């Protein structure tokens, strides 16, 4: 066999695409970075695939009533944070204990659309939970 045939050639090696054409915003960021490179106000770009977690939840604010209104008439009541959390939200502070598992399918609770929240099937790669966990409701297996 010819030695040059043994070498695998990259068919895309001759193609050159400028980065600014791939991401138009990148060119603008590079221009801004070059003009104010000595500025300490710049923040580093995020380095992960995920967006940062919010540090706090937005709280409802009281809406002032119309002018001349007495008392709290026309004002929206301020609700506490517990009222804003949905009962099935796995990220709420009122979630079930971490690692709570069952020997079989968990019992159906009030308000459960599905009889369980199982993330243990082999086709679900969304988490690494133990069998029959109640952490998520994203599994495609439904046991009725």
Swiss-Prot record:
Location of the protein in the cell: Cornified envelope
Tissue: Expressed in the stratum granulosum, in skin and oral epithelia (at protein level).
InterPro entries in the record: UPF0574 (IPR018904)
GO BP terms in the entry: biological process involved in interaction with symbiont; establishment of skin barrier
Start-end of Polar residues biased regions: 78-98
One annotated Gene Ontology cellular component of this protein: extracellular exosome
Region (Disordered): 51-105
Primary localization class, coarse: other
Gene Ontology terms for molecular function: identical protein binding
Listed Pfam families: DUF2477
Family statement: Belongs to the CYSRT1 family.
Stored PANTHER family: CYSTEINE-RICH TAIL PROTEIN 1
Description of how the protein assembles with itself and partners: Interacts with LCE1B; the interaction is direct. Interacts with LCE2C; the interaction is direct. Interacts with LCE3A; the interaction is direct. Interacts with LCE3C; the interaction is direct. Interacts with LCE4A; the interaction is direct. Interacts with LCE5A; the interaction is direct. Interacts with LCE1C. Interacts with LCE1D. Interacts with LCE1E. Interacts with LCE2A. Interacts with LCE3D. Interacts with LCE3E. Interacts with LCE1A.
Function: Component of the stratum corneum that may contribute to epidermal antimicrobial host defenses.
Name of this chain's protein: Cysteine-rich tail protein 1
The species this protein was found in: Homo sapiens
Gene, per the UniProt record: CYSRT1
